[in-house]
């Protein structure tokens, strides 16, 4: 490697350390203090505060609309997969406890347990939650009913129906919201919002970029993450050109669903009758994980305005999914809810890899083994391409002496040098870029794995050797606060090993690209799910074995295509002249 290459590698490593420092500093910082919110003193009713979607105002928690004083109480309903804790404070699911999924300290995963508003709570303005409900539990089907009558005579009845043990989707809760006009006058509302509850990292190492608010309108899914609320600028350079934002608010027709997601879990509210017309979302300061501040996201799905004549009643129905980001379960909910997986542009590759990994797991019963076997299958399928690329690179290596002579001859004429090089490649039938082909093919596969392994619930708490959780970085210890993750380091080492034994093409630009690849992949994988580093390390080792099988072969003796063509033509003529027996 030349001097410039070493300088670039050192700068990349320094960038990795700087990014790790900034990552911890930025995402451990709590959001700006909230502005004035509704407060209540004993014996008084809280005052409703109506937020407006302006960047200047901060909003950390939804306000409570004015409501009569009612004693707070909770009611739990359980199934074999989840326990739902209902609260009459805002008439919704205070938290959903997923009994089959473990979080820190081997405790069950709790959704919506981080100081956020209840799932299924309603409000009549963006950022507002209506409280003061009476709560009843009725029937054998575990239904929980909330009732409230507002001062103008609008009666609100909310009925939650948790899933049965044998339900096809064990995390889908039904919700009916009914409005009845008990007054003698016409009542009008400018629509209402149904809360998605909140989402926040479950594990201290979960990536904040997966804490998102997603919504689908007209079949198109849009989303923001917690960084959307940050001031515009470059924080570590002290540059800022726009202020922090506190409320995300959008008005769109034909909204099918809205939801909040963390890295491996999500809560989605889907309208089943009337299409939604608006959404809102805010960021909030969630409960600390391992003494680290984490940020959460909460939001709501809004329905259009309605009017009720005296005695008239209307109702809307919703489905609420509060559970793991399971592709099949989300796809079964319809309406493109599987977009909550956030697979991105290589989603079709991610879906295939997830299906293949789960299929192999059905035979092996181990996800680390499934990833290794899947990697070997992929490498075997790409063997013809890899073998052809290796042969082409060996041809390039055979031309290396000629290229050295040519560089010396035309060292002061770069354009002439390039022209002569390309002429030589054509004469000898060599493709100088063929060595990059296997890497170009594997890049989409890598990003498919990257997206899949970053969201696939299957990998949570799956172990491999020293790795306790394949969905998290494999940090063994820290040095001055910097995590030492072994698998990405082994992965980078295997890439360097592969680079050393790969036939040199003689092309300086191609060699420089190869030098950078270990550092680039190290940055990509260092703080990511260790399963990704396991995949790339496995494929590197398999490539090294392939290279060792071919490296001891002598370099090919190259001839110009014109010479080969003449010899073949002469052989053809000789064959035609041969007398028939």
Please place each PLM-identified region on the residue numbering.
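Transmembrane alpha-helices
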Residues: 433-448
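Membrane-protein biogenesis/insertion across secretory and organellar systems
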Residues: 1-380, 557-581
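Membrane-water interface of transmembrane alpha-helices in multipass transporters/channels
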Residues: 369, 458-467, 508-513
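Active-site lining segments that contact anionic ligands and/or coordinate catalytic metals
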Residues: 6, 264, 298, 315, ...
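Conserved catalytic motifs of ABC-family nucleotide-binding domains
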Residues: 449-494
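Terminal, Lys/Arg-rich, intrinsically disordered segments and adjacent short helical elements
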Residues: 1-62, 383, 387-434, 476, ...
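Transmembrane alpha-helical segments that form the functional core of multipass membrane systems
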Residues: 339-408, 415-416, 422, 426, ...
């Amino acid at each position: 490697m030349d001097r410039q290459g070493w300088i670039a590698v050192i700068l990349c490593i320094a960038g990795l350390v700087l990014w790790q420092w900034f990552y911890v500093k930025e995402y451990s910082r709590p959001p700006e203090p909230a502005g004035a919110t509704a407060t209540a003193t004993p014996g008084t009713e809280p005052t409703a505060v109506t937020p407006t979607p302006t960047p200047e105002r901060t909003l950390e928690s939804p306000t409570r609309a004015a409501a009569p004083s009612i004693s707070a109480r909770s009611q739990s309903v359980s199934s074999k997969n989840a326990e739902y804790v209902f609260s009459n404070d805002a008439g919704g699911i205070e938290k959903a406890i997923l009994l089959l999924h473990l979080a820190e300290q081997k405790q069950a995963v709790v959704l919506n347990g981080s100081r956020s508003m209840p799932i299924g709570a309603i409000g009549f303005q963006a950022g507002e939650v209506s409280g003061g409900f009476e709560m009843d539990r009725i029937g054998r089907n575990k239904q929980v009913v909330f009732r409230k009558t507002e001062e103008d005579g609008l009666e609100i009845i909310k009925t939650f129906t948790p899933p049965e043990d044998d339900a096809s989707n064990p995390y889908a809760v039904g919700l009916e919201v009914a409005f009845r006009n008990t007054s003698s006058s016409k009542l009008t509302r400018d629509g209402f919002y149904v809360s998605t509850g909140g989402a926040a990292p479950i594990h201290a190492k979960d990536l904040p970029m997966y804490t998102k608010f997603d919504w689908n309108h007209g079949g198109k899914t849009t989303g923001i993450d917690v960084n959307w609320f940050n001031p515009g600028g470059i924080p570590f350079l002290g540059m800022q050109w726009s202020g922090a934002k506190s409320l995300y608010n959008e008005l769109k027709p034909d909204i099918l669903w809205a939801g909040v997601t963390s890295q491996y879990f999500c809560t989605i509210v889907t309208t089943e009758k009337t299409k939604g017309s608006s959404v809102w979302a805010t960021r909030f300061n969630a409960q600390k994980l391992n003494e680290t501040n984490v940020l959460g996201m909460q939001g709501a799905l809004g329905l259009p305005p309605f009017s009720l004549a005296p005695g008239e009643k209307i109702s809307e129905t919703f489905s609420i999914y509060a559970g793991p980001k399971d592709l099949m379960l989300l796809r079964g909910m319809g309406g493109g809810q599987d977009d909550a997986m956030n697979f991105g542009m290589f989603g079709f590759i991610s879906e295939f890899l997830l299906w293949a990994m789960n299929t192999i797991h059905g035979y092996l019963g181990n996800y680390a083994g499934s990833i290794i076997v899947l990697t070997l299958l992929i490498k075997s399928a790409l063997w013809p391409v890899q073998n052809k690329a290796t042969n082409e690179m060996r041809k390039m290596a055979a031309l290396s002496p000629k290229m050295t002579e040519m560089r010396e001859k035309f060292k002061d004429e770069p354009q002439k040098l390039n022209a002569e090089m390309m002429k030589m490649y054509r004469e000898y039938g060599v493709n100088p870029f063929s060595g990059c082909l296997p890497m170009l093919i594997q890049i989409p596969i890598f990003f498919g794995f990257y997206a899949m392994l970053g969201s696939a619930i299957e990998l949570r708490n799956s172990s491999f050797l020293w790795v306790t959780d394949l969905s998290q970085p494999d940090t063994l210890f820290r040095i001055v606060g910097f995590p030492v993750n072994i698998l990405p380091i082994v992965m980078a080492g295997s890439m360097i090993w592969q680079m050393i034994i790969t036939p040199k093409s003689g092309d300086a630009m191609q060699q420089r690209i190869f030098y950078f690849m270990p550092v680039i992949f190290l940055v990509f994988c260092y703080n990511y799910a260790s399963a990704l580093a396991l995949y790339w390390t496995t494929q590197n080792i398999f490539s090294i074995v392939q290279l060792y099988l071919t490296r001891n072969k002598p370099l090919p003796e190259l001839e110009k295509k014109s010479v080969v063509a003449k010899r073949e033509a002469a052989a053809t003529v000789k064959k035609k002249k041969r007398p028939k027996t």
